[in-house]
Regions:
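Electrostatic cytochrome c docking/interface patches
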Residues: 30-56, 70-71, 152, 157, ...
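Non-transmembrane interaction and regulatory regions of membrane-associated proteins
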Residues: 76-77, 102-110
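Protein kinase-like catalytic domain
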Residues: 64, 98, 102, 136-139
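C-terminal capping alpha-helices of c-type cytochrome domains
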Residues: 3-26, 92, 118-157
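The canonical Cys-X-X-Cys-His
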Residues: 51, 57-67, 94, 131-135
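Short sequence/structural segments immediately N-terminal
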Residues: 4-5, 37-40, 48, 52-57, ...
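Gly/Gly-Pro-rich "capping" loops immediately C-terminal to redox-active cysteine motifs
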Residues: 52, 65-99, 114-122
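Inter-heme linker and motif-flanking segments adjacent to c-type heme-binding CXXCH motifs
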Residues: 68-73, 106, 137-146
Length: 163
């Protein structure tokens, strides 16, 4: 093997290894989550860690952000944040969505095809159920939800918010 080929192989190994470590690193620790954010999970810690590993292994964090962090540096995709998503959708909805062979039929996207939510129908049923349970557990404190809705209303209408 030539010297240049060896260097290229080492570079590839570093990139692949770094990507794998990044996916392991994105399983948030309690310390990282405890930043005074208005988001929380209702799952027991052991279940949450198991679900976070599924989220990480299925590259959800490549596009979606969570716990006030950013999505992976590997892709720049305008995917929705997952913080508080369980305050909007329930476990049954998430399970149906993750089980669909065509998630676009349930929740259409205007993103380019390569950035659209992939189907997770081929995952084992237990994994989809764990992910759905976890996503449904991601709540947002009521005061924050009210303030967010108020800001969105005022932004869209230009009028003061009146519940």
């Amino acid at each position: 093997m030539r010297r240049g080929e060896k260097g290229i192989l080492i570079l590839i190994a570093v990139v692949v290894g770094g990507t794998m470590l990044k996916n392991l690193w994105t399983v948030m620790t309690d310390k990282e989550k405890d930043r005074g954010l208005p988001f929380y999970s209702t799952l027991p810690q052991a279940e949450e860690k198991k679900a976070m590993l599924l989220i990480s292994n299925n590259q959800c964090r490549d596009c979606h952000s969570l716990w006030g962090g950013e999505a992976s540096f590997m892709r720049n995709v305008p995917a929705p944040r997952l913080d508080g998503i369980g305050s909007i959708r329930d476990e049954g909805w998430f399970y149906t969505y993750l089980s669909s062979k065509d998630p676009q039929a349930i929740l259409p996207s205007r993103l380019k095809q390569e950035y659209r939510m992939p189907s997770y129908a081929s995952l084992p049923d237990e994994d989809r159920r764990e992910m759905a349970k976890y996503l449904a557990s991601l709540k947002v404190k009521n005061w924050y939800l009210t303030e967010t809705r108020k800001a969105e209303y005022e932004k869209l209408t230009g009028k003061p918010y009146q519940p």
